[in-house]
Design a protein with these regions (language model features):
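Hot-dog-fold acyl-thioester-processing enzymes
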Residues: 2-90, 152-171, 176, 180-274, ...
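A cross-kingdom feature marking solvent-exposed beta-strand/loop segments within repeated
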Residues: 88-99, 113-115, 270-281, 296
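HotDog/MaoC-like acyl-thioester-processing domains
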Residues: 2-18, 101-179, 184, 285, ...
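Short, structured motif recognition centered on aromatic/hydrophobic residues
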Residues: 38, 92, 107-111, 127, ...
């Protein structure tokens, strides 16, 4: 007697429809152990995510989870339902961090499908979802939109009516939340004398340092977030893929590039919003990540705190001081891995 399949094959493009609500399994409680592992794997050096005493003096309740760390956990919860059969995660928009995530907090994740469009090849389609992470008190701690290219189950299945969501180019500075009172910020302990007043729109910052990513560590990082995407783990299964080997989770690139940005942006450690993001090209074990940033905008949030809108560009195996980005035809330059636009809090003088 044949039994019904009890394992999860993941959703294909045909399984999604606009308005679909998905409750993702396995809430995750984050601890100080998670903070230590994240620091070990991403190299995070920002003072408010390294020292409990500094964090309290800087207006946080204590040693908090880095917002990107929490983002990866919430993202990871959505993978089995959204992107287990994905070809690629294409981009991010309208990401907002509402509350700090503290050790002992438990993150739950839900998503709503807000857009869908079959690709012209008839083999894949793009699905847009808004994913929200809440804590154990059902308080939203973050929300973001991402879109992913997903395989169809059958190429001959009819295409659904296309719905493409209208997304903001950036989170308005007036809607940023969760920023601290930074009047007692200690420049000596933070590692930089530069504040909001020292950065100019259009300024580019070479973050100088590089970090080579190895096979084992990127898998440990991805498992930390309980991200189960096949392309990151199954070496045997990926032999017949487009690249013939495992891909490094794009979140690893974001976190390492962000950690490298400490050298030049040490006082801008708290991410307030994700405006946009694209994984431009793949990263593989043995590649080295470098990064540079451009100041896109500035905004005053309070008497003690400002925000910098930053474009973080990660490049592979090349000098970040060349500021590789796009050519005259609008195409990304060779070696560009990541184009990530975000707001960060920074103390004012």
């Amino acid at each position: 007697m044949a039994s019904a399949q009890k394992s999860n094959p993941g959703n294909y493009f045909e399984d999604f429809h606009v308005g679909m609500d998905i409750v993702h399994a396995t809430p995750q409680t984050l601890t100080e152990g998670d903070i230590a592992l994240y620091r070990a794997m991403a190299g995070n050096r920002f003072a408010q995510y390294s020292s409990a005493e500094f964090a309290r003096a800087a207006g946080l309740p204590g040693l908090a989870i880095d917002p990107l760390h929490a983002f990866h956990v919430v993202f990871g919860k959505s993978v089995p339902d959204i992107s287990l059969n994905a070809v690629a995660n294409l981009g991010y928009a309208d990401g907002r961090f509402f509350l700090p995530v503290m050790p002992g907090d438990t993150l739950n994740t839900v998503s709503k499908v807000i857009g869908i469009k079959e690709n012209s090849n008839g083999k894949t389609g793009v699905v847009w979802v808004r994913t929200t992470g809440t804590n154990q008190r059902a308080e939203p701690v973050m929300s973001f939109v991402r879109w992913v290219m997903v395989n169809k189950y059958e190429m001959d299945n009819p295409a659904p009516e296309a719905v493409v969501p209208d997304l903001p180019a950036a989170v308005p500075a007036s809607e940023l939340s969760g920023f601290p009172d930074m009047k007692t910020w200690d420049m000596a302990l933070s590692g930089s004398p530069y504040t909001y007043d020292d950065y100019a729109v259009g300024e580019k910052i070479n973050h100088v340092d590089g970090m080579t990513v190895e096979e084992a560590e990127h898998q440990i990082a991805t498992r930390l977030y309980q991200n189960t995407a096949k392309v990151h783990f199954d070496a045997h299964g990926q032999k017949d893929s487009r690249f013939g080997k495992r891909l490094i989770y794009g979140g690893v690139v974001i976190s390492i590039a962000r950690s490298l940005a400490f050298n030049g942006l040490a006082n801008a450690g708290q991410m307030l919003a994700i405006n946009a993001g694209s994984h431009v090209s793949p990263l593989f074990a043995g590649d080295t990540i470098y990064a540079w940033s451009e100041v896109l905008d500035k905004a005053t949030l309070s008497d003690t705190c400002g925000a910098l809108r930053l474009r973080l560009v990660a490049v592979k195996d090349q000098d970040p001081g060349a500021f590789a980005y796009k050519s005259d035809d609008g195409k990304y330059a060779g070696g560009v891995l990541l184009d990530f636009d975000y707001w960060a809090a920074i103390p004012k003088r």
